[in-house]
Amino acid sequence: MLGLSGCKGGAVADNAEEKASGKGLVIGWSQRGISGSDWWKTLVEGGQAEAGKVGARIELLDANGDTVRQNADVQTLITKGVDVVVMNPNDPLGLGPSVQALKDAGIPVVTVNSSLDKSLVPDMFCYVAEDQEHTGSLAGESLAQKALEKYGDQGQIKIVGIGGFPGDVLSDLRFNGFMTGWNRVMDKHPGVTTVKLDTKYGEWKPDKALAPIRDVATANPDLKVIYSMSDVMHGGIVQGLQQAGLWGDGILMASYDGGMGAIKEMVDDPKGPLQADASNQPWDQGAAAVRMALAAFNGDQSQCADKTNYIDTTVITPAEAPDYYVPTDTYVRAKD
């Protein structure tokens, strides 16, 4: 009996040691939604690829935009005995029951792309995302340089941003970041006066973005710079500017997401209006979430200081677009 007991203990120890390296680790992935979103699909695929590299396995459950269902999904993952949970929260506060259940079960939780309410953060190991304000600033800085090249360092530059919804955090962070980057450049050129128009909103949909951008362009025929806070609205913005007679050589545009369609546009038309696209790299966010899940299993908080892990992001201009364009991908990935 002692021999059998010793053998079992050794096997358990070996298993724990293997999981510490990722081999055999079971990661429960609670996704807010996948259907209809190439971005979320890419996020999950990045996580799955990273798990495969270290020998871990992902148990994926999709809540399809339903917070009640996502809470039930987390309970299912707990019942299945997963080692750690990666969660893409549908509702920052509504997943409180799941966070408490995971805490009671001794299962660490990593959030990715969207975080939890601040009241729940103490029970979260790590939040993985891009720093949206910093990423937006990359686009602003890049487009400001393009504007100086195109319009010179004297005169007025009228600019408008188009976001998702009034007051939504994503729009605020992305636009504030853009203007920080823009002003960082333009502050060195006092001959340029930036006239910032009121932000317009397109509900993150191309058809909803068309009318607002058309109307502001019609009312401001001297509009020179447009910043779209998501590539998904790009088609509607282009149509709106075309209808207002402004799409073409007189306009400069930056966008946000790093969608492959935007990258291809810059490859095909390097002198066109679109001159910068800030990339938030969902594949890399998913991969980082799995790395943080492994760190959480090992209790290594040093891997996620301050409970936040921002991935490195970049901005792509027509000069870099050929290097980042991969027809089989939907979004830009980090370069090795």
Residue ranges and their predicted role:
Residues 1-5:
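Sec-dependent bacterial lipoprotein signal peptides
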Residues 6-336:
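A residue-level marker of the well-folded mature domains of exported/periplasmic proteins
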